[in-house]
Swiss-Prot record:
The RNAP catalytic core consists of 2 alpha, 1 beta, 1 beta' and 1 omega subunit. When a sigma factor is associated with the core the holoenzyme is formed, which can initiate transcription. Belongs to the RNA polymerase beta chain family. PANTHER family: DNA-DIRECTED RNA POLYMERASE I SUBUNIT 2. Its EC number is 2.7.7.6. This is DNA-directed RNA polymerase subunit beta. One of its GO terms (molecular function) is DNA binding.
Length: 1357
């Protein structure tokens, strides 16, 4: 495979040994495919499957009125184009959504009064507007009210049946109490559970317990049927010596008989009591001709009857089925002369316990009617039951598809667990299902089978955005259904149309509520491209229908063997959410049932094949799967005779021939963020967790720099996140500037398609986290690019690779205590050269409303404000773009009418004569908050439709229209140039049969075309029909494109001039964007990729920094004590390898300088061959020269996780770069010039600046807001609060005996209201005396004591 456009500019040398046979799936596919399946927007209405939105409509409609005289049915739905595009929605605080039109059919029937027969009277069809449905952007996000949001996928327990026990915790004896639970997708939960007395109970929706047999009665079984379902019968025949029973060898294997076994034929004892009968002995008895055993009357006592016992003479039932055999019953039997007796085959010794029989005995009900009434009383306590209501309620519980839905997943799971064969579309429960569940539960109690592991990923599934939305929309439609039914009954059904019946508000409200306030609809983490990707791949066990933090135990949060290749064992938050919020592994995908699948490569007879299968956790348990690092020969065969494999969750050695699958890649175990950590295998898991989490907090820097030591994942993340722009088609770069790239396509050309692709770049946009989104082109005019090549870098990307931080020279050594406890000492060079400088954009907005006292006004005329404060405002009262603003500066001037006391008639007259007073308004301007500074970079003014625009709004609008016009003209020029070039190529050399006036017929030449105006080329007729068809297609495409451009321009201008939709009462809104350049400073947090984090303690002059023998000063000094106890040795290996990369880069830089001197690339090529050791290199000299220049700062390498560089590789590269293989160097003290006594580890490391900036945290207050009750200052920067002086601080002052300082702290500096006012007055007077009074909190205490009935009075003196 050839090198890509960016790949040949900077080749990353990989240390990976294991070839990857499967391409990694698109990282945000989970989101996009799920929502596409829900909307089915591109699928024609007739071809839509019964899933997603189609399924929701089908499940709710048709809706019948109560009299069944009319039916409203759903036909199809379609989406109209969205009103605003994504960018416009973000600017106007709107939701990016498409109007949903649903075709409804209303059928009205004629009902014959006498016969009740119905005939169709009228059918009306109509499109009904059903609200707006939010659309997903190309990046897998939603724009809701102007902000980008992500719907996080939810992990929940799969529908189906689960068996478990209480682990001996319920009963004091420690006895296991088994339970079964049938969980539907929608509907009532059904639980079965054993109690300590071995009676089986059932619960509906976790309500009061009932005997399980009550449910069986309600299902229509009687007592004998229940017993015959759960137990076999043993027939005893009367004989002279006692009773004979057939000998069944299977029943006696491994059993200790309680009594002697006697042969019925001979009377011999064949097995004594208490001695275990082996399987072999049991078989031998049968082989020796043992057919029946002889038992005495005592043996029958304690047995249970299988049938009702009837006295044949009187017809009286003297013993019922299930009754325990007693001496009286036995006597009665003998008296009636019974020759044959059926007993239930219940014998705990043979593994059949009397649980169902005991439940029957404990059940007070003995008929279906009684059971139904009992269930009704539990479900609807307080309501009087009737047989009809009880029956209807019971049917609705499990057997009505509208109220109960197992879902296809639930049915599949149930069939597998219970070994049933019900069809997938059987979504309700059946009698057979309930009986099978009870049989399995009883089997578990008898010691047969295993309980389920609820944390196994075969029992947990993922609900992605499409499914979550489907559930929410169903709720909205069900609310709407009730309203439709009521309206159908209350209107004249003959005259109404479908839209009169449908009120779409409940459906629209459900959608709005879901996207706006659901726990799973989250404000997107947009700090950098990695944080976006990770957020979209997140799996949460929280949210509606999920777990809660408080209830989740250790088991749910723990790593499970089935997580392998599906959920990352490393990336999860620290704190209360640990283990509840996870991330999908790199290669994982979600199947149609919602189970996570991981890819494996098929192995046949020890040989690897190219077949790749995706397996879910359930399927995987059946196979033996080798790890990706298993030794494989060059011919693709497993090398070792025995291979380490995972089989059903355990790791064992398996013979080579028995291996069925092998992992596709070592990194399929971990998530995207963890796969970006080089030498992950050398880091402790806790630190790797911090490393993967902190990469998501890295701030995009002004100059991005890809890591020298990477893992090969960087380009994949940059591409899939959408931060970098990739070419859609192969072509040549026609035009490039900062805001757009134009590519002339050279492949995939079609006369009906445009020949040029135009890519617009985002410039200095604000992200959700106030970081800066800026894209810049990396191509030049004339460059040839292929489809998929990166043509523009985005935030935190460098030549199409993720670049979260910078590569800096670090030394591990203590430095005068400035790197104590993870502090970081940095060189002044880092600040001077803007190495870690970032741009942050803050948005401030203000709205002018129409109040009861009059409209607010945005103006420059503000009362009691000097001209100095207004220096940055224009005539309209809005700050100018480019103004430097600091805390307290006015951004937008605004005045609000004051409320005043009623005026006397005289005052009204004076007011009418002399006009308004200035004092009638108060200043409510938008000011910069405390601690904030920056430069105004953009101002947007929004006016309500119909409100007059001020000069600033008009000038912004004029500029915007000019920009749109220029855009349209530029695009039209590009389009025309391309179209006429293609038209010219098409006409040249062909034979013209007609043309414009003066055009010579015959062969078309270039000169003839040059002499003819281009607009006349269309009139040239050719004798070649195929060519003419192409000309016509080209003309149609040109006309269509021109019309589309004009239409888009007019549409955008119309939107600009029309005015904006505003919230109620808002007349005008102004948004001001302020950019601030944040340099690195003490207090900022930095981190590496291995969980090594610290805070900058000091910025040291370059001359004081430790330096190398060649005079180069190190950039950063880190504490060596941060490594051994944290066990993240990966950072040391990265440092060494980074040092080697930089050394090799310098060597290549020297070779490049030689090329610049003598013009020959021979030296450069040989150096590159030495570094890349046979890897593919560019062919042309210009490409080689550019590669040499790009690599002069360091050779980038990839060390994939679990398959990266080993220690010998690192030493080899250090030697190759000309360094000591120990990786240590002699450093000199910058302050004295003396060498340090011992060698120091120096190297290059990729460090990140995290989004915990001291500027956002530091805060100071003199006076500010106070709490209403206690009158103490509020806390926190957001509330402009004070510094808390707590209990322990009070102890400190007490210990020092600083009585006056303490008194001041507790009174005038806190909540002594009168005292603090006096202090303020004293300061104004220039005085420094004050007197402390009573703190307000003491008054609160007194009031609280009085409220408790304790009167507290203060006495003076």
């Amino acid at each position: 495979m050839g090198l890509s456009f960016t790949g040949k500019k900077r080749i990353r040398k990989s240390f990976g040994r294991i070839p990857e046979t499967v391409a990694m799936p698109n990282l945000i596919e989970v989101q996009k495919s799920s929502y596409e399946h829900f909307l089915m927007k591109e699928v024609p209405a007739a071809e839509r499957d019964d899933t997603g939105m189609q399924a929701v409509f089908k499940s709710v409609f048709p809706v019948k009125d109560f009299a069944e005289r009319a039916v409203l049915d759903f036909v199809s739905y379609e989406f109209e184009p969205p009103k605003f595009d994504v960018e416009e929605c973000q600017q106007r605080d709107m939701t990016f959504a498409a109007p949903l039109k649903v075709k409804m059919r209303l059928i009205v029937f004629d009902v014959d009064e006498e016969t009740g027969a119905r005939s169709v009277k009228d059918i009306k069809e109509q499109d009904v507007y059903m609200g707006d449905i939010p659309l997903m952007t190309d990046k897998g996000t939603f724009v809701v009210n102007g902000t980008e949001r992500v719907i996080v996928s939810q992990m929940h327990r799969s529908p189906g049946v689960f068996f478990d026990h209480d682990r001996g915790k319920t009963h004091a004896s420690g006895k296991y109490l088994f339970a079964a639970r049938i969980i539907p997708y929608r509907g009532s939960w059904l639980d079965f559970e054993f109690d300590a007395k071995d009676v089986v109970h059932m619960r509906l929706d976790r309500r009061r317990k009932l005997p399980a047999t009550t449910l069986l009665y309600a299902l229509g079984l009687d007592k004998e049927e229940i017993l015959s379902t759960f137990y076999d019968t043993v027939t005893y025949k009367a004989s002279k010596k006692g009773w004979t029973v057939p000998y069944v060898k299977e029943r006696w294997r491994g059993v200790k008989p309680a009594r002697d076994l006697v042969d019925a034929k001979t009377g011999d004892i064949i097995a004594p009591a208490g001695k275990k009968i082996s399987a072999r002995a049991a078989n031998k008895f049968a082989d020796d001709g043992l057919a029946a055993l002889l038992v005495s009357d005592e043996h029958l006592l304690g047995g249970y009857l299988a049938d009702d016992m009837v006295n044949l003479e009187t017809g009286e039932i003297f013993a019922e089925a299930g009754d325990e055999m007693s001496e009286e019953i036995l006597e009665t039997l003998k008296d009636t002369g019974v020759k044959e007796l059926n007993l239930l085959d219940i014998d705990p010794a043979t593994g059949v316990g009397p649980y169902i029989r005991a439940t029957l005995a404990a059940d007070k009900n003995d008929s279906r009617e009684q059971a139904l009434v009992d269930i009704y009383r539990v479900m609807r306590p307080g309501e009087p039951p009737t047989p009809e209501t009880a029956e209807a309620m019971f049917q609705g519980l499990f057997f009505d598809s509208e109220r109960y839905d197992l879902s296809a997943v639930g049915r599949v799971k149930m069939n597998m667990r219970l070994d049933l064969d019900a069809p997938d579309d059987m979504r309700t429960l059946r009698k057979e299902d309930i009986l099978a569940v009870l049989k399995t539960l009883v089997g578990l109690r008898d010691g047969r089978g295993e309980i389920d592991d609820i944390d196994n990923l075969g029992n947990r599934r993922v609900r992605s955005v499409g499914e979550l939305m489907e559930n929410q929309y169903r709720i909205g439609l069900l609310r709407m259904e009730r309203a439709i039914k009521e309206r159908m009954s209350s209107v004249d059904i003959e005259t109404v149309m479908p839209h009169d019946l449908v009120n779409a508000k409940p459906a629209a409200a459900a959608v709005r509520e879901f996207f706006g306030s659901s726990q799973l609809s989250q404000f997107m983490d947009q700090t950098n491209p990695l944080s976006e990707v990770t957020h979209k791949r997140r799996l949460s066990a929280l949210g509606p229908g999920g777990l809660t933090r408080e209830r989740a135990g250790f088991e749910v949060r723990d790593v499970h063997p089935t997580h392998y290749g599906r959920i990352c064992p490393i990336e999860t938050p620290e704190g209360p959410n640990i283990g509840l919020i996870n991330s999908l592994s790199t290669f994982a995908r979600v199947n149609k049932y919602g189970f996570i699948e991981s890819p494996y490569r098929k192995v046949e007879n020890g040989k690897l094949t190219d077949q790749v299968d995706y397996l879910s956790a359930m399927q995987e348990s059946r196979y033996s799967i080798a790890q990706a690092n298993a030794h494989v020969t060059e011919s693709g065969e497993l090398d070792n005779e025995f291979v380490n494999c995972r089989v059903a969750g355990d790791v064992t050695l398996v013979p080579r021939e028995d291996v069925e699958y092998i992992d596709v890649s070592p990194k399929q175990v971990v998530s995207v963020a963890a796969a970006l950590i080089p030498f992950l295998e050398n880091d402790d898991a806790n630190r790797a967790l911090m490393g993967s989490n902190m990469q998501r907090q890295a701030v995009p820097l002004v100059k991005a720099e890809a890591p020298l030591v990477g893992t090969g994942m960087e380009s994949i993340v940059a591409r899939d996140s959408g931060a970098a722009i990739a070419a859609r088609r192969t072509g040549v770069i026609e035009q490039v500037d900062a805001t757009r790239i134009v590519i002339r396509a050279t492949e995939d050309l079609d006369a009906a398609k445009s020949g040029v692709d135009i890519y617009r770049l985002s410039k200095f946009q604000r992200s959700n986290q106030s970081t800066c989104i800026n894209q810049r082109p990396i191509v030049r005019v004339g460059d040839q690019v292929h489809a998929g090549d990166i043509i523009a870098d985005g935030p935190s990307t460098d030549l199409g690779e993720l670049a979260l931080g910078r590569n800096v020279v670090v030394a591990f050594m203590p430095w005068n205590g400035y790197n104590f406890e993870d502090s970081i000492l940095i060189s002044e060079r880092i600040v001077r050269d803007d190495v870690f400088t970032s741009i942050h954009l803050e948005e401030f907005e203000i709205a002018a409303r129409d109040t009861k006292l009059g409209p607010e006004e945005i103006t420059r005329d503000i009362p009691n404000v000097g001209e100095e404060a207004l220096r940055n405002l224009d005539e309209a009262g809005i700050v100018a773009v480019g103004a430097e603003v600091a805390a307290g500066d006015i951004l937008v001037g605004k005045v609000t009418p004051k409320g005043e006391s009623p005026m006397t008639p005289e005052e009204k007259l004076l007011r009418a004569i002399f006009g308004e007073k200035a004092s009638d308004v108060r200043d409510t301007s938008l000011r910069m908050p405390s601690g904030a500074t920056g430069t105004v970079v953009e101002v947007r003014v929004f006016n309500r439709h119909g409100v007059d625009k001020d000069e600033r709004a008009i000038s912004i609008e004029r500029e915007e229209i000019e920009r749109l016009g220029k855009d349209r003209d530029d695009e039209l020029a590009i389009l025309e140039r391309n179209i006429y070039q293609r038209l010219g190529d098409l006409l040249l050399g062909k034979t013209a049969v007609s043309g414009p006036r003066g055009f010579a017929k015959g062969k078309v030449s270039q000169d003839a075309l040059d002499e003819t105006p281009r607009s006349g080329w269309w009139r040239i007729g050719l004798d070649d029909e195929k060519a003419m068809a192409e000309v016509e297609a080209l003309q149609k495409q040109y006309d269509d494109s021109k019309a589309r451009l004009d239409r888009r321009f007019e549409d955008k201008v119309d939107k600009l001039q029309r005015g904006d939709e505003m919230p109620p009462g808002v007349m005008k809104m102004v948004k001001v964007f302020v950019a601030v350049k944040r340099k690195l400073q003490p207090g900022d947090k930095m981190a590496g990729r291995h969980g090594n984090k610290g805070v900058i303690s000091k910025i040291n002059p370059i001359e004081d920094m430790p330096f190398l023998a060649n005079g180069e000063a190190v950039d950063i000094v880190l504490n060596p004590l941060g490594v051994p106890s944290r066990m993240n040795v990966g950072q040391i290996l990265e440092t060494h390898l980074g040092w080697a990369c930089r050394g090799l880069g310098k060597q290549l830089g020297e070779a490049y300088d030689a090329y610049k001197r003598d013009g020959s690339t021979a030296t450069l090529r040989s150096e590159l061959d030495r570094v890349y050791e046979g890897d593919e290199l560019p062919e042309t000299d210009s490409d080689i020269a550019e590669l040499g220049l790009n690599l002069s700062n360091g050779v980038p390498i990839a060390t994939p996780v679990f398959d990266g560089a080993r220690e010998p590789d690192v030493a080899h590269w250090l030697t190759k770069a000309g360094f000591d293989p120990s990786g240590q160097s002699t450093l000199y003290d910058g302050q004295t010039g003396e060498p340090f006594r011992r060698k120091v580890t120096v190297g290059v490391k990729h460090l990140l600046k995290l989004h915990h900036l001291v500027d956002d945290k530091i805060h100071a207050r003199s006076i500010g807001p106070y709490s209403l009750v206690t009158q103490q200052p509020l806390g926190g920067k957001a509330q402009f609060g004070g510094q808390r002086f707590g209990e322990m601080e009070v102890w400190a002052l007490e210990a020092y005996g600083a009585a006056y300082t303490l008194q001041e702290m507790l009174t005038v500096k806190s909540d002594d209201v009168a005292g603090r006012t006096k202090v303020y007055e004293a300061i104004v007077r220039g005085d420094d005396t004050f007197e402390a009074g009573v703190p307000e909190s003491f008054n609160v205490l007194v009031k609280e004591m009085r409220s408790l009935g304790l009167n507290v009075e203060l006495k003076n003196g």
